[in-house]
């Protein structure tokens, strides 16, 4: 009761101030404007006439589009049971890479041998013509799943967000079974290395939800291209 009456008196006092003739009209419009709407501003001149002007558009939304720069990408499939002819996951990644406008620099298949994997990835990292390495397979918890142990020691910096983003995207498809993936990524010698599970579905999730945009130099507000080029103009 008492609070209601007091609140009503305050509202009445506020209304008196807002509707007072001497209260600047533009302040009144400020208090009651609809957020997000762009409207003409009306100002009253000293002679009593009103002038109207349109506020400028937000120039931040009109940035010039970034150019597309293709990357040289190598693909490694890790499997004890597949051959290149049966490698549907590696083939999916190759097709996706080409469709996105990038260049396939190399593609091979190795068994789950930690040292063979490490040697191949290290060679690609040392190759200044290769900017991205995509690895499919060997990221689980079985005894022969050695990809994380093979490549993590090669990283100068880890890309923690890749594994997080991949597992988050996978929840809609496989639920909490996504915890069984040790997907990881890192950068070494300006080469980005992304490790994902061996299934074709997992490769598609990683590419469509994470890699496709982050390897595209046009993606705003940021992408991996500047970290992978040795050109001073784009770094």
Give a label for each model feature.
Residues 7-11, 16, 36, 47:
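Short linear segments in intrinsically disordered or otherwise low-structure-confidence regions
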Residues 8, 22, 27, 52-235:
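Non-catalytic beta/alpha edge segments that cap or flank active sites
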Residues 15-29, 37:
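Cationic, amphipathic, low-complexity segments that mediate targeting or membrane/lipid association
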Residues 5, 29, 33, 38-39, ...:
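Basic polycationic patches enriched in arginine
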Residues 1-3:
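Glycine-biased, low-complexity coil/linker segments
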Residues 20-21, 31, 41, 48, ...:
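Short hydrophobic alpha-helical segments enriched in small aliphatic residues
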């Amino acid at each position: 009761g008492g609070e209601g009456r007091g609140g009503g008196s305050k509202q009445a006092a506020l209304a008196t101030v807002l509707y007072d003739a001497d209260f600047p009209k533009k302040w009144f419009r400020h208090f009651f404007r609809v957020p997000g709407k762009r409207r003409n501003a009306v100002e009253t001149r000293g002679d009593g006439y009103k002038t109207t002007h349109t506020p400028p558009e937000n120039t931040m939304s009109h940035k010039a589009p970034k150019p597309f720069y293709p990357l040289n990408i190598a693909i490694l499939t890790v499997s004890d049971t597949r051959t290149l002819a049966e490698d549907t996951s590696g083939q999916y990644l190759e097709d996706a890479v080409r469709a996105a406008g990038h260049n396939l620099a190399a593609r091979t298949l190795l068994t789950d041998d930690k040292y063979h994997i490490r040697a191949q990835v290290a060679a690609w990292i040392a190759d200044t013509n290769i900017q991205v390495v995509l690895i499919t397979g060997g990221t689980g918890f079985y005894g022969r799943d050695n990809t994380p142990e093979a490549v993590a020691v090669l990283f100068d910096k880890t890309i923690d967000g890749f594994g997080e983003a991949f597992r988050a995207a996978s929840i809609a498809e496989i639920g909490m079974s996504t915890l069984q993936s040790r997907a990881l990524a890192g950068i070494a010698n300006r080469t980005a290395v992304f490790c994902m599970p061996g299934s074709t579905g997992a490769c598609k999730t990683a590419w469509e939800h994470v890699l496709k945009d982050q390897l595209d130099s046009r993606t705003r507000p940021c992408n991996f291209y500047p970290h992978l080029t040795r050109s001073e103009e784009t770094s």
